[in-house]
């Protein structure tokens, strides 16, 4: 989902 995609681009989004 968006969170996973964001995590790939920016780890900050993951946390």
From Swiss-Prot:
> Which keywords does this chain's UniProt record carry?
Amidation, Disulfide bond, Secreted, Toxin
Q: Which family does it belong to?
A: Belongs to the conotoxin T superfamily.
Residues crossing the lipid bilayer are none
Q: Name one GO cellular component term.
A: extracellular region
Cell compartments where the protein resides? Secreted
Q: What is this protein called?
A: Conotoxin tx5e
**Residues with Threonine amide modification:** 15
Q: How is it modified after translation?
A: Contains 2 disulfide bonds that can be either 'C1-C3, C2-C4' or 'C1-C4, C2-C3', since these disulfide connectivities have been observed for conotoxins with cysteine framework V (for examples, see AC P0DQQ7 and AC P81755).
Record remark on domains: The cysteine framework is V (CC-CC).
Q: Does the keyword Coiled coil apply?
A: no
Q: Which cysteines are joined by disulfide bonds?
A: none
Domain of life from the UniProt record: Eukaryota
Q: Does the keyword Secreted apply?
A: yes
How is expression of this protein distributed across tissues? Expressed by the venom duct.
Q: Give the GO molecular function terms.
A: toxin activity
């Amino acid at each position: 989902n968006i969170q996973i995609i964001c995590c790939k681009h920016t780890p900050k989004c993951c946390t």
